[in-house]
Amino acid sequence: MDMRAPAQVFGFLLLWFPGARCDIQMTQSPSSLSASLGERVSLTCRASQDIHGYLNLFQQKPGETIKHLIYETSNLDSGVPKRFSGSRSGSDYSLIIGSLESEDFADYYCLQYASSP
């Protein structure tokens, strides 16, 4: 049985708050991908300027409310499985799913919240 299923696995939620820098561009890659159960999946968003690690990552499944996964680049929110992790390399911020499970097929969003200087 082919367990490969297409999944929209990354998107962006760009919100602005008073005092937040609105001139920062966020670029996603890939915009979507297909993956098999058990695979390691990496999703990246790139900031056009330094956001000092101020990045949150979210997950949304069809028909469900959005769920907060990771704050400040790499800190897991309470109850988030350990197969999820976040990392940073320069201006690239990644969400990594160590071993994809069926419940992980969803849309994923990043939110930068860097403060103004």
Curated annotation (Swiss-Prot):
- Which stretches of sequence are listed as region Complementarity-determining-3? 111-117
Renumbered to this chain, region (Framework-2) spans 57-71
Q: What ranges does the record give for the region Framework-3, renumbered to this chain?
A: 79-110
- Keyword match Signal: yes
Query: What cellular component terms from Gene Ontology apply here?
Result: immunoglobulin complex
Give the signal peptide range: 1-22
**What InterPro entries does this protein map onto?**
Ig-like_dom_sf, Ig-like_fold, Ig_V-set, IgV_Light_Chain
Concerning Gene3D superfamilies, the annotation shows:
Immunoglobulins
Q: Does the keyword Ligase apply?
A: no
Region Complementarity-determining-2: start-end pairs:
72-78
Region annotated Framework-1 sits at 23-45
Q: Between which residues do disulfide bridges form?
A: 45-110
Region Complementarity-determining-1, annotated ranges:
46-56
UniProt keyword annotations, A-Z:
Adaptive immunity, Disulfide bond, Immunity, Immunoglobulin, Signal
Could you tell me the Gene Ontology terms of the biological process aspect for this record? adaptive immune response; immune response
Q: Which Pfam families match?
A: V-set
Name of this chain's protein: Immunoglobulin kappa variable 9-129
In its UniProt entry, the species of origin is given as Mus musculus (Mouse)
Q: Which gene encodes it?
A: Igkv9-129
